[in-house]
Each structure stands twice: as structure tokens, then as C-alpha cells.
Amino acid sequence: MRVDEEPEFLTVENPWLYNERNVSCIPKGVYNIRPHKSPRYGLVLAVDDVPNRSHILIHAGNTAADTKGCILVGERFGNVKDMRAVMQSRFALNRLLSMITEPCQMEISYGYDHG
């Protein structure tokens, strides 16, 4: 993940599964993001206007098993229970939240092009 064109964070998402809710990564595109208080995860970033999806968040977690279609951020890659993971996720999320305090836009530019 880049902030102001500079590499800042590593991410983990589920693979492309045809934008199926709760299991697929989100499609390429430009999305509005904003700080959001989640009952489950606390202060996170909400990703708005994802086609046919809702409640997409950028939150802390380590592996794709920790997400249901959301984006996880971390400081470095590692392994958890033999799965690829991002590490220092809470630290990375807090750092990201300190950079993004107002609504802004995020572009997903790598991954599956849904058409």
C-alpha cells in the first residue's frame, strides 16, 4: 500500500473470487475511504462504494483467514501457522490511521481486473 505514492504498508487480502461477499478481495478501482469506529475492530478505515459489497474495512489481522473480504495492513511479511501473513498489523494500522484522519480516496491498482 502506498501513501502519497510512497510505499508504506504491506497488505493481505483474500484472492479474487468473483467479488463474492465475505470471501473475495475487492475489485480494482478508486474508492472513498474514511476513519470509522467498528464495533468489532475499533477505529479502522471504511472502504465505501465497492460494487455489490458493503462493510469493507482496512483493519488489523495477520492472514487471509483473519479477513472476510477486507484488507489487512502490516509492516512486514511472515508466516502464521504455515500461512503467508503480515506482521505488526496493529502497529501498521495505527500508523495508517495517523496519516489518514479525513475522508480521502484509495486506488486498488493491482489484482484482478473485473472488467
Locate each region found by the language model:
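Cell wall/extracellular polymer interaction/catalysis modules
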Residues: 1-104, 110-115
